[in-house]
Amino acid sequence: MRLPGRHVLYALSAVTMLAACSSNGARGGIASTNMNPTNPPATAETATVSPTPAPQSARTETWINLQVGDCLADLPPADLSRITVTIVDCATAHSAEVYLRAPVAVDAAVVSMANRDCAAGFAPYTGQSVDTSPYSVAYLIDSHQDRTGADPTPSTVICLLQPANGQLLTGSARR
């Protein structure tokens, strides 16, 4: 499948033989209420103020652990000499957004399969056709290398959207 020039799909692939490391740090926020001790409420009822969620701070993650909806400040280099990426809140400037994770077979057609899956998953996530959108598509392939043949789709394609003009995104492309 060929897409217009600005929507060229490219792959960054790697054989990932290491265990995936993930940080499960708890996120917390600070809630405050404005209480005036000199003027207590006239009734026994007290007002409750819902805490404002703290903005999600940037975190480092291995790219094989990326999830749909993650926004990336940076992409791993094509040679995959770095296996981590910085995930940021989508409201901040970012270079790419994950819109699909899909299992794929590892064979000679892996690139064709990744192209097909990423193209098919684009419209359901963004509400737009890849051909008429302001985005280009890229993907990463996590090759689990199940050599037993027990898993017919041992790899995962991680589809990313990026601005076709090379600028940064602000906000999510999810519809």
Swiss-Prot record:
Membrane topology: Lipid-anchor
Subcellular location: Cell membrane; Cell surface
Lipid-modified sites (N-palmitoyl cysteine): C21
Residue stretches of biased makeup (Low complexity): 33-48
Assigned keywords, A-Z: Cell membrane, Lipoprotein, Membrane, Palmitate, Signal
Superkingdom: Bacteria
Region (Disordered): 31-56
Signal peptide as annotated in the record: 1-20
Region of interest (Prevents bacterial uptake by a human macrophage-like cell line), ranges: 61-80, 101-120, 121-140
Lipidated residue numbers (S-diacylglycerol cysteine): C21
GO cellular component entries: cell surface; plasma membrane
Domain notes: Fragments of the mature protein (residues 61-80, 101-120 and 121-140) prevent uptake of M.tuberculosis by a human macrophage-like cell line.
The protein's role, per its UniProt record: Probably involved in bacterial recognition and uptake by its host (human).
Full protein name: Putative lipoprotein LppN
Natural source organism: Mycobacterium tuberculosis (strain ATCC 25618 / H37Rv)
This protein's encoding gene: lppN
